[in-house]
Amino acid sequence: VSDPSEPEDEPAEYQLIRSPFPMVRKLQRSLPADYAGPAYIWDIDKTWLDTRFSQLRGMLKIPFEFAVDKQALPGTTALLHALRQGPSEREHRPLYFITASPPFIRKAIERKMLIDGIEFDGITYKDQVEVFRRREFGSLKEHTAFKLGALLLLAREFPIGTQLYMFGDDAERDALLYCMFADICAGRLRGEALVRAQVELGALQHYAEEVASLAEEVPARELVRAIHIHMVCEPDGGR
């Protein structure tokens, strides 16, 4: 939910969100109520781009780099084009990105998308600056409530005929969080059980409760059709 009392630090096309978690979102398309077909949600860091945006050292370098210097993981840009275009190559299937990267590096990320010809319908950034301002330092690296909240905000708007395909990596917890999201959408994980699951993963209690409250606004259905995870960790946990 946007708070109109917040200062307008972001350009008009970006939505400042404070609940269920601080984030900044840009939506460029609303799907018609009768839409029936696939939609795709992608992570960015280590799923599309070979970067570490979510780590402090990586984030600090981004504003000083050129978008052309950022490297996509092999094959991912072609895959994004194919998913977007569909079999007819002109379907413009819905494509969204959710990233724990902070909004201040959005220009570098979106410029890279422009260079690579990647059309997208929405992108959500974790508002790390607001989290820091709130002195919730443990939430800077803990992404559970952010990612579930961002996903549920999208799910609430998807038409009933949407079939969701999700792409992430194992550098963090994408597989687990995507599975939790699938269970939330299907009605298998709601209420106090959802709050406890988030807190056990490190989410703050008040964020966990806000995510659980948002989940009640999402109609129960089997929304998620497939989850694809890029394996970047070694068996011993190394990267």
Feature annotation, model-predicted:
Residues 65-93, 103-107, 145:
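Short, acidic loop-to-helix structural element flanking the phosphoryl-transfer center
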Residues 50-70, 185-203:
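A solvent-exposed, charged loop/short amphipathic helix patch at secondary-structure junctions
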Residues 1-42:
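Non-catalytic pre-domain segments flanking phosphatase-related domains
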Residues 86-96, 158-163:
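Short, surface-exposed connector motifs at secondary-structure boundaries
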Residues 51-54, 61-63, 67-73, 97-118:
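A metal-dependent, Asp-based hydrolase signature
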Residues 101-239:
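C-terminal cap/substrate-recognition subdomain and adjoining C-terminal extension
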Residues 38-51, 178:
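Asp-based phosphoryl-transfer active-site loop
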Residues 42, 96-97, 165-166:
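Structural recognition of the beta-strand scaffold that forms the well-ordered cores
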